[in-house]
């Protein structure tokens, strides 16, 4: 970041991690500590490094306990300290909920970054009974979006831009070339409403970029997990025509951006 500012004095630069605010499963102090631990590892490790130029203290203590501290070369610490972002970009899909670990958690090779499964002696993943889930098991938490924005702005006091937010689903193309994805419209509407509320809370937002404009290959599920406003006629086993079809959400979001987010109606 320092090099960017040196080479391009008028440029703005910032990190763009994937952030999932972590809730404790209960008000038990042990669960609260577990949530703090996972928040530090899952979220603040990246942003503390980018914004403040130092490792998060909880993560560093964990690394020391496990003899896993990185080695710093000459000038590394200074380079980190001198990198000052102008903004924070972040991806948001859901929150996570955890409880205290009993030390028996095993690494789950099928887990992904959006499903908190557990880490021995650190936290144990907990299914939040208050939240619905997508067809792929990710919890849906629009209000958690607002909570995430509030927490990030309180910690870092930098303007933010949402670099990814969207719903992966099994979309169906009708015989007349339509995709009726009202579920995606509802998902996006509720999340955009929460951004607007976060702005009234005092958070500074630069922009919102939904994921995504067009169906593409998901790293875990391939083409079957669709995010786009535009349907691509093809799947993992058959390229088909690769023709493009505008989904209902395409026309809805066109209206949203033409009104600068003021019109979220159907």
Regions found by a protein language model. Give the residues of each.
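Active-site region of glycoside hydrolase catalytic domains
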Residues: 1-266
